[in-house]
Amino acid sequence: MVHFTAEEKAAITSLWGKMNVEEAGGEALGRLLVVYPWTQRFFDNFGNLSSPSAILGNPKVKAHGKKVLTSFGDAIKNMDNLKTTFAKLSELHCDKLHVDPENFRLLGNVLVIILATHFGKEFTPEVQAASQKLVSAVAIAL
């Protein structure tokens, strides 16, 4: 189990409260699919994923990205109990969809990049460290 300090929790919660989940979620999933094209195989029912512009403009990518970031919101509310929080999603993604757990780590890293682009100077090294810790813990839980 990962332990988050009060400062880490505060930094993550504060940043998350300012996040546009719909916008950032679409960007994060879209970037994952562009940068790591082998991840597209899990989204063959999303239609046109033939180019970066097609992926980033795809409404299904945006909708699923929002769903993914909404789940990250659940993680923020339950930082001390991530394994239980993600038990059902873990079962779905690993046991039924056979998603390589490495893909969750990649998505977490992409999300940290999105946070940095959205929050600029507010995304200090301390906030980055806390965010990286959270996305790594979520990847492990999944």
Swiss-Prot record:
Sorted alphabetically, the keyword list is:
Heme, Iron, Metal-binding, Oxygen transport, Phosphoprotein, Transport
Tissue expression, as annotated, is: Red blood cells.
> InterPro entries of this UniProt entry?
Globin, Globin-like_sf, Globin/Proto, Hemoglobin_b, Hemoglobin_oxygen_transport
Q: What SUPFAM superfamilies does this protein's entry cite?
A: Globin-like
One short Pfam name that applies is: Globin
Kindly indicate where the leader peptide sits in this chain: none
* Subunit structure as annotated in this protein's UniProt entry: Heterotetramer of two alpha chains and two epsilon chains in early embryonic hemoglobin Gower-2; two zeta chains and two epsilon chains in early embryonic hemoglobin Gower-1.
- Write the protein's name: Hemoglobin subunit epsilon
